[in-house]
Structures are given as C-alpha cells and as structure tokens.
Amino acid sequence: MKRDDLVSPECMDGDNVYETTLRPHSIKEYVGQKKIKKTLPIFVEAAQKRKEALDHVLLYGPPGLGKTTLALIIAREMGFNIKVTSGPVIERPGDLAAILTNLKDYDILFIDEIHRLPHSVEEILYPAMEDFYIDIVIGQGPSARSMKLDIPKFTLVGATTRAGLLTSPLRDRFGISFRLDYYAVEELTKIINRSASIMSIEIEHSGALEIAKRSRGTPRIANRLLKRVRDYAQVKGEGIIKRAVAVHALEMLEIDDRGFDQMDRSILLSIIENYGGGPVGIDTLCATVGEEKTTIEDVYEPYLIKEGYLQKTARGRIATKKAYEHFGKRKFEVGQKELF
C-alpha cells in the first residue's frame, strides 16, 4: 500500500482481509449512524412479523463509511442468506437473471456501486423489484419471443457513492433509503478501541483519540491507520499505542492533525499559490496536481468541502479562509488590501 493510499476511503488491496474480521455482526455492535440504528431495527422487525421480504434498501454516501457492513447486518438481522456483487461485474442482462433465479425467498441481494449498472441490466431490475418477475428473451431475430419468469421474493440492497447518478426509475423503487454521514471523532475512537481489542493491540485512550482525529471521519481509514501505528509502536513504542507514539507515527506517514496527506495539501496549495485562491477549473487543477478527475472528486473533495477548506462553485474550486489559515498564509488581491 502506498503512503498516499492510507487516507483514501476507497477499499485497497489488503483491506478486505482485516475488514472481514473487524466488521460488527449486529446493529447493536454497529457504532455511529444513529438515525439508521434507530429506524432499521423497526423495519426489520415489522417485515419479520408480516413474514415478508424487507423493502428494498438504498445506502448512499462517501466510501468507507460502512455500506457493505450494513448490508451484511441486514441479512443477519433478517436471518437469510446474502449474495454480494457489484455493478461493474454484472455486464449483461443474463448475468443478473442468473443471480436472481438462484436466490431463495427473502434472500438479500447486495449490489455495490449500483450506479454503474449498464442500462440494459437496470431495466431487468424494474419488474424484479416491483413484482418479482423478469422478462427473458428466447431465440433471436423475428422468431424471438419474450417469456415471463417468476423469481423469489427478495430484498435488494443497493450501495452507491454517487446517488445523483442513479436514474429516477431505479431510485424510486427503493422503499428504504439511508444516507451514511461522516463519523464524529468520539465514534471513531470507539471503533478504534474495538478494533484494537479484536487485533490484540494495547492502546491508550489518548492514542485512539489521536488516530481518530486524523481519520477523516471514516472507519476504513481509522482501521488502516491503526494497523500502521501498531507497526510503529511495536518497533519504537514498546508495543503500546500512546498519544506520543500515534503522533510520531502519523507525522512520519505525513498525515497531519487534520488528516490531510500529501495530495490534500497539494490540491489546496496549488489553488492558493498557483491560482490566487481560485476559482480554478477541475481539469486545470487535475493537470496541476497530476491526479485523475474522478479521484479528486470522489476521494479528496468531499472531505475538504465538508471540513470547510474548499468551495465547489460553477466557476471552479476556491480555497477558503480556513485553508489559508491552516497553511499559515494570508490572501491578497492585486490592487486591494489584505482580505483576511
């Protein structure tokens, strides 16, 4: 794993190994997302009492916040099997038809990155979600005919980081919709302490708190940083993660007290130093920092915007006063007095 990948909320190679171990197995163990924890058990219990499939569920929000974990918890709480797949994997209508026909009543079908489903595949989902049947075409050319095929009563759980890319017909078919928000530092501290216990890592509360502060509100990043700080503690800190050990480890990894890595700093400093604070177009910014547009938009911008360091406008990206203060800089405009 590259150093710059440490604070990426995207799932990296090697993440799945420890994420499977660290995931909570019930809604009671799940930390954060208070609204979901309050309402989801009600929907699950109501479906169980009616002996019906749970309404289709849409989970959306930034990556790394626990959408896959929630899908697995839904399956466990309902007491049925779950089939896990993703939008890019389902390339043809026949691929989806094969998955649907192999489900059993009340099973859970989890489709990650559901916004990336091909349109032809998405159309198969419409009758499947509403009336639990699919139309399959038999034969080719003039002799081809359509046949209605009933499928089990299932629950679709769709996850996406780009809810705006979902078509209205698909989005409207989800009876339950949850937005996952970034986690508070206190919630991340609980997650880190829980993960440390599972991984047999000795950690002080102050050490967990320091890691949480630099985890960008994202559990996936928190667990990833915990592993790297553990390595440092075993070599430099007698195996115990204290605050000083966490600070030194994260500074060595060039992750500052706001959770910024080299690319975060490069984005903000490029806007400040090269473009007078902005606005600057996204394509120009990408060329300046040497990063792909989708990576900037999906990985870096959401956190910078949420924390108030970056503004996204119709004219381009603008560094805020908070960004200037973070780097100890002051903004001037030609021919004008100091703004801040």
From Swiss-Prot:
It is found in: Cytoplasm. It holds the Pfam family AAA_lid_4. Residues 184-254 are annotated as: Small ATPAse domain (RuvB-S). Its EC number is 3.6.4.-. Residues 257-340 are annotated as: Head domain (RuvB-H). It catalyses: ATP + H2O = ADP + phosphate + H(+). Mg(2+) binds at residue 68. Residues 1-183 are annotated as: Large ATPase domain (RuvB-L). Has 3 domains, the large (RuvB-L) and small ATPase (RuvB-S) domains and the C-terminal head (RuvB-H) domain. The head domain binds DNA, while the ATPase domains jointly bind ATP, ADP or are empty depending on the state of the subunit in the translocation cycle. During a single DNA translocation step the structure of each domain remains the same, but their relative positions change. The RuvA-RuvB-RuvC complex processes Holliday junction (HJ) DNA during genetic recombination and DNA repair, while the RuvA-RuvB complex plays an important role in the rescue of blocked DNA replication forks via replication fork reversal (RFR). RuvA specifically binds to HJ cruciform DNA, conferring on it an open structure. The RuvB hexamer acts as an ATP-dependent pump, pulling dsDNA into and through the RuvAB complex. RuvB forms 2 homohexamers on either side of HJ DNA bound by 1 or 2 RuvA tetramers; 4 subunits per hexamer contact DNA at a time. This is Holliday junction branch migration complex subunit RuvB. It comes from Syntrophus aciditrophicus (strain SB). The gene is ruvB.
